[in-house]
Amino acid sequence: MGASGVQMATRFVTTYECDADEAYKQSYIDAKKEDIVIVQSPVGMPGRAILNPFMKRAKEGQIPHGKCHLCISTCKPEQTPYCITEALVNAVKGRVDKALLFCGANAYRAVKLEHVRDIMEEFRPVEG
């Protein structure tokens, strides 16, 4: 009896085909196991992210609030440590030191850029 499918996302961030900014991809490659942490997002849900300078400042309450975009009804700007919209836009634009870098538990296992076809080849059954 074997698996009929798997769900993966993190593994494909560090592929040539992924349209994420190169600095975002490099953050995964540079991450160590202890850099992957559970964070509380401004919307009240926990998430897994890379502990970068932004997240360190957020934990210390050192990120000033700008204008609220009213993008998420559950967000309470007066109680949140940072604006999730700005943090995610920074990630998209490659400003990784000012970004929330969501990731999976095994993001630290990415060691290089590779092609999707090579990752998929790893899952092909071994003949014989």
Feature locations, PLM:
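Conserved active-site-proximal phosphate/metal-binding subdomains
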Residues: M1-G128
